[in-house]
């Protein structure tokens, strides 16, 4: 239930003999003086039964159903998290390029109110997804997740601005995400891997040069 940029083999090495399953919530929030201010949707991503390798998968899904939680099973949970990280890197690096990460809420608000900046986000996400593809991920297996980023950037930017204006919970997730180290980890992980793999990413590169902690 967190962002990571590591391989499945590395995750298995961390876990050792511990029985686990990979999942990811549709959620966001922050801690202030032991108080959690957050948003939790009734939907999560869940590793498929064959790859999860746990004996009580049916019990887990029954539990989710009893709590009125819906789940979706991607082709591969690790790859899905990489894609999620890439999308985050495109969004947050664009937001942060124009200011200091000490005030991420203000940066998020400025971004959500500008269709031109959101259009740039789409282009940055496309570059970040090329990094994921360069790691060996077949993006065609994630068509549904990536469809919004195929739309012409100027149209997508306007649509995103309207979506953020109308969807209070999605907007709140953006403004509550204030862990600057997590934000920087996400951006830096994707960017460094792109450099190592020789991926051309001029927008991400310009964004990263503008970020200050």
Region spans (language model):
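Exposed alpha-helical structural elements
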Residues: 10, 59, 81, 116, ...
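Rossmann-like NAD(P)(H) cofactor-binding subdomain of soluble oxidoreductases
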Residues: 1-35
């Amino acid at each position: 239930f967190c962002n990571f940029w590591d391989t499945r083999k590395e995750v298995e090495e961390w876990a050792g003999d511990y029985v686990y399953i990979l999942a990811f919530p549709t959620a966001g929030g922050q801690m202030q003086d032991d108080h959690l201010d957050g948003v939790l949707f009734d939907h999560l991503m869940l590793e498929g039964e064959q790859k999860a390798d746990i004996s009580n998968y049916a019990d887990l899904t029954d539990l989710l159903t009893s709590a009125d939680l819906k789940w979706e099973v991607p082709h591969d949970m690790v790859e899905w998290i990489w894609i999620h990280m890439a999308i985050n890197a495109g969004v947050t690096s664009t937001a942060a390029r124009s200011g200091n990460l000490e005030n991420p809420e203000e940066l998020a608000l400025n971004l959500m109110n500008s269709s031109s900046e959101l259009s740039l986000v789409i282009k940055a996400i496309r570059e970040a997804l090329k990094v994921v593809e360069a790691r060996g991920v077949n993006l065609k297996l994630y068509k549904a997740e990536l469809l919004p980023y195929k739309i012409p950037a100027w149209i997508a930017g306007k649509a995103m601005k309207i979506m953020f204006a109308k969807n209070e919970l999605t907007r709140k997730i953006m403004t509550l995400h204030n862990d600057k180290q997590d934000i920087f980890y996400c951006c830096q992980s994707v960017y460094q891997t792109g450099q190592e793999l020789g991926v051309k990413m001029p927008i991400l590169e310009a964004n990263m040069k503008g970020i200050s902690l």
